[in-house]
C-alpha cells in the first residue's frame, strides 16, 4: 500500500489512482532563463523517485512537465521584468535563443542525474491559445478585473483561496507593505499582462484584452488540464511553490472547473548551502557542470540526495558529497564483483517495498541496501536484488564497470614478489608486500585464476 504526504490536507494518505492503472503526474518545470542549480535539481530527483515508485507499484504514469519560457516575472508578486527578457539582455541573445539553450542544458542535467524524461514536455509559448481560452473561461464566470497593466484574478471571490498554504488573508492585507498599484488585494495576481506601449517585447501576443503575455501561473493550469484533465492524481513542485504559485493554480482551476486541480499536492524541500537556501538570486550557485569540473560523477549527487527524506531540508557541503561518492563506488564495485544476477530475495524485496511505499522513505531504503550488501546471501541473489532496488535508486548499477587502467611496472613487480612469497608460504612477507601495494593506491585480489590488481575503487563517469 503506497502512502504519500499531501500538502493540501497536511496528512499522509493512501494513494489510490483516480483512473487505475493510469496515473496523471504533473511536475512544475524550469524557467529557462539561466542554468538550473543543484538545489533546483534536488526537487526533480525527488519527483523522479516518485515516478519510479509509482511504476514499481504497477501504475502506468503519464508524466507532464512544463517549460516556463515566458511570463515569469522577477517577483512572484507580478512586479519586475520578465526573466526571459532580462536573460536576453544579460546574454546578448534573443529570448527565444536563450529559452532553447537553457532548455537543452536542463535536459542534459537530467540525463546526467538519470532522471527519467517526462512523457510529455510542454512549453508555455506553444500553448498561448490554451492559456487565453482558460482566462476567458475564468472571466466569463466573474473572477477577473482589468487594470491599466493587465487582467487580474480577484481572489476575494474564492472564500478558501490560499488553503494550500494556510494563508491568513486578513493578516496579509493588514500587514502589506508593498505598492499594489491597481490590485484590489495583495493576493490578486495577473492572468494576462499588457505590453508597455513604449516598449517592444520579444515575446508578446495578441489577445482579446490587448497585446501582451500570459501571467506565470496560468500556463500550468491550462497545460495540465489539457493533457491530464481538470482533476488528476498528483501535482509536484518545490516547497517555494506552496505559498504563491500552487495556490494560484488551484484558484484558477476552481474558477474554471470547480476542482482543486490535483488529488495530491507534493513538495520537495530545499537544498541548503552552508544552512542557507541555494538560489540564483543570491548571486552564486552550483551547477551539475560544477560537480563534473571538480571530478565528481553526477550520480554521486543523486546518491547524496537519497540520504535525506524529500520533506527534510538537506545541507550541502563537499565533505558530504565526498562521502556519497565513496559510498556509491563501494556499491558499484560490490555489484560488479557479484557477477551474473540470480533470483531475487523476496524478503528483502518486501522490506524495500515497505520503505519506498512509506512516503518515499529513501534514507531507510538506502540503509536496507547496505544491509543487503553485508548479508550472507549468495552473490547472485544479492546482485539480482540490488539491481531491482536500483529501479528506484536510479544509480545505473547494471551499467558500471571499473575503469581499465595500466598498472605500473613497479606495482606489478610487487605483485609478482607477493605471489612468490605466498607460493613459498612466507605469509608475513606476503602481507608486507600487500601493504606496500595498498599504500601505493592499488589493491590486489586473489582468485582461482591468479592475482588481480587495480587502482582502489576508481569509478568511470
Question: What are the residue ranges of the model-derived segments?
Answer:
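Structural preference for alpha-helix termini/caps and helix-kink/transition segments
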Residues: 277-280, 284-461
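N-terminal, positively charged nucleic-acid-binding surface of large information/translation enzymes
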Residues: 9-12, 18-114, 449, 453
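Short secondary-structure capping/junction motifs at helix and strand boundaries
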Residues: 60, 97, 107, 111-123, ...
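The substrate-binding groove and active-site-proximal loops of carbohydrate-active enzymes
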Residues: 88-94, 119-125, 210, 238-239
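Alpha-helical recognition segments enriched in aromatics with Gly/Pro capping
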Residues: 1-33, 48, 101, 107-108, ...
Amino acid at each position: 500500500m503506497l502512502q504519500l504526504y499531501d500538502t493540501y490536507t497536511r496528512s499522509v494518505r493512501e494513494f489510490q489512482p483516480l483512473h487505475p492503472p493510469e496515473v496523471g503526474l504533473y511536475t512544475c518545470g524550469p524557467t529557462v532563463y539561466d542554468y538550473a542549480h543543484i538545489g533546483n535539481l534536488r526537487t526533480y530527483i525527488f519527483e523522479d523517485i516518485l515516478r519510479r515508485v509509482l511504476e514499481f507499484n504497477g501504475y502506468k504514469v503519464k508524466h507532464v512537465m512544463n517549460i516556463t519560457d515566458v511570463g515569469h516575472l522577477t517577483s512572484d508578486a507580478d512586479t519586475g521584468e520578465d526573466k526571459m527578457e532580462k536573460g536576453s539582455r544579460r546574454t546578448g541573445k534573443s529570448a527565444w535563443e536563450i529559452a532553447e539553450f537553457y532548455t537543452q542544458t536542463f535536459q542534459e542535467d537530467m540525463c546526467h542525474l538519470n532522471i527519467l524524461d517526462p512523457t510529455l514536455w510542454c512549453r508555455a509559448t506553444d500553448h498561448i491559445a490554451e492559456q487565453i481560452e482558460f482566462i476567458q473561461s475564468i472571466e466569463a464566470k466573474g473572477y477577473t478585473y482589468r487594470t491599466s497593466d493587465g487582467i487580474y484574478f480577484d481572489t476575494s471571490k474564492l472564500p478558501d483561496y490560499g488553503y494550500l498554504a494556510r494563508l491568513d488573508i486578513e493578516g496579509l492585507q493588514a500587514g502589506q507593505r508593498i505598492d499594489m498599484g491597481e490590485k484590489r488585494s495583495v493576493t490578486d495576481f495577473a492572468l494576462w499582462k499588457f505590453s508597455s506601449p513604449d516598449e517592444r517585447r520579444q515575446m508578446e501576443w495578441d489577445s482579446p484584452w490587448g497585446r501582451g503575455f500570459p501571467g506565470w501561473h496560468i500556463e500550468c493550469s491550462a497545460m495540465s488540464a489539457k493533457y491530464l484533465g481538470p482533476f488528476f492524481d498528483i501535482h509536484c513542485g518545490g516547497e517555494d511553490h506552496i505559498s504563491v504559485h500552487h495556490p494560484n493554480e488551484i484558484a484558477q482551476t476552481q474558477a474554471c472547473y470547480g476542482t482543486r486541480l490535483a488529488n495530491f499536492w507534493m513538495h520537495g524541500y530545499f537544498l541548503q548551502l552552508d544552512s542557507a537556501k541555494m538560489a540564483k538570486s543570491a548571486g552564486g550557485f552550483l551547477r551539475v557542470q560544477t560537480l563534473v569540473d571538480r571530478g565528481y560523477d553526477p550520480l554521486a549527487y543523486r546518491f547524496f540526495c537519497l540520504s535525506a527524506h524529500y520533506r527534510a531540508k538537506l545541507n550541502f557541503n563537499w565533505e558530504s558529497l565526498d562521502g556519497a561518492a565513496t559510498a556509491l563506488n563501494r556499491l558499484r564495485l560490490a555489484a560488479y564483483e557479484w557477477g551474473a544476477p540470480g533470483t531475487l530475495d523476496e524478503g528483502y524485496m518486501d522490506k524495500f517495498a515497505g520503505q519506498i511505499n512509506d512516503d518515499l522513505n529513501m534514507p531507510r531504503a538506502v540503509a536496507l541496501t547496505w544491509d543487503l550488501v553485508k548479508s550472507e546471501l549468495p552473490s547472485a541473489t544479492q546482485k539480482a536484488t540490488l539491481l531491482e532496488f536500483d529501479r528506484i535508486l536510479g544509480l545505473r548499477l547494471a551499467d558500471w564497470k571499473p575503469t581499465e587502467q595500466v598498472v605500473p611496472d613497479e606495482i606489478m613487480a610487487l605483485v609478482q614478489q607477493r605471489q612468490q612469497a605466498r607460493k613459498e608460504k612466507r605469509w608475513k612477507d606476503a602481507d608486507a608486500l600487500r601493504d606496500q601495494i595498498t599504500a601505493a593506491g592499488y589493491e590486489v585480489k586473489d582468485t582461482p585464476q591468479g592475482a588481480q590488481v587495480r587502482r582502489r575503487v576508481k569509478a568511470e563517469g
